[in-house]
A protein has these predicted regions:
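Positively charged, small/polar-rich N-terminal and surface patches that mediate targeting and assembly
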Residues: 1-126
Length: 126
């Protein structure tokens, strides 16, 4: 069992969610986060091309020390679905430009379903 954590652009969340659903992956957790890599900040790209929001976003980025708003997706999967998820996220989000995102894969050693007390792979929605 693995956890896949993907950090993507905010404006790519719906496309990513649809592509994962089309690939048979429907269970996930997502949240807003702030972060940055080593690249420089190019505001129009990070703002999803919505020119009306430039002033608001510039002000917000200044408050947060130039951290960029992103989406973080967490998926807990059986080992055999990890490559499918990774390939799908890359296919949808890869533009070849700085800020496309990051994907991390981590082992999950134990899991339980609170409602039933089941444990292990049985708790995964497949």
């Amino acid at each position: 069992m693995k956890e896949v954590m993907a950090i993507i652009r905010m404006n790519m969340m719906n496309k990513t969610k649809r592509a994962l659903a089309d690939a048979g992956i429907s269970s996930m957790y997502a949240k807003e986060c702030l972060g940055r890599g080593k690249g420089t900040v190019e505001l129009p790209r990070y703002m999803g091309g919505v020119e009306e929001q430039y002033a608001d976003m510039i002000q917000e980025l200044g408050v947060f020390g130039r951290l960029i708003p992103k989406r973080m997706i967490h998926l807990i999967l059986p080992d055999n679905l990890v490559k499918t998820v990774v390939n799908t996220v890359i296919q949808v989000n890869q533009t070849g430009r700085s800020g496309d995102g990051k994907i991390f894969v981590m082992p999950v050693t134990e899991s339980w379903r609170v409602r039933t007390g089941e444990s292990g792979d049985e708790v995964l929605d497949q």
